[in-house]
Structures are given as C-alpha cells and as structure tokens.
C-alpha cells in the first residue's frame, strides 16, 4: 500500500525535535536526523504492516475516528487504511504525538 502523511504529522516531528535540541545540549543534529529517518522509514513500512496494528487507544479523538496506532521512537502515530474507488488500499497517517508531550 502507498503511504500518505498529513502535513500536521511532519510539523509535529519537526517542532518536537527543534524543541528537544534547544533544551538538551547533548542532542546533536546528526542524532536527530537519524531518529527522524527511522520515523519516516517506519511510516513508509506501514504500507506493508498497517493491517496488523491495533485500534488507537492514546487519544479520545483517535478512538472516535477509528484510527489505528503504531509507536516508533516514542512517537505515537494515528493512521487509517482507505480503499480507493479502483480497489487500491492506501494508508494515511493523520496525527502524531510524542509520549513526553501527551497529557
């Protein structure tokens, strides 16, 4: 399946790591880039593994929207599988939150 990532997810990842680098002087740009690469690799792998992850449990709006959830690098991602008119399945990642920021 093809994977599509909402702009809000990109923004959440960038803002978290920008803040982390400002607050933790030992966190360097090379380390952050490796973590971000792992996040995007994991999201791309949803094209293969999306159907095995459970229904979201972290946020109430994720639950009400019927999203599924997976976790990578302490980020929780909410996504849904859609079937297009031609029968093709796609994955759309709708939202993300880091474990440290969720209240």
Question: Model segments located where?
Answer:
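Basic, Lys/Arg-enriched alpha-helical interface segments
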Residues: 1-67
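Enriched for short, Lys/Arg-rich terminal
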Residues: 65-103
């Amino acid at each position: 399946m093809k994977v599509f990532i909402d702009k809000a997810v990109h923004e959440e990842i960038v803002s978290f790591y920008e803040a982390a680098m400002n607050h933790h002087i030992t966190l360097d740009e090379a380390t952050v880039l490796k973590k971000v690469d792992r996040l995007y690799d994991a999201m791309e792998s949803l094209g293969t593994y999306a159907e095995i992850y459970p229904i979201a449990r972290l946020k109430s709006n994720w639950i009400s929207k019927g999203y599924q959830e997976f976790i990578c690098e302490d980020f929780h991602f909410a996504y849904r599988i859609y079937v297009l008119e031609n029968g093709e399945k796609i994955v759309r990642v709708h939202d993300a939150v880091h474990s440290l920021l969720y209240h």
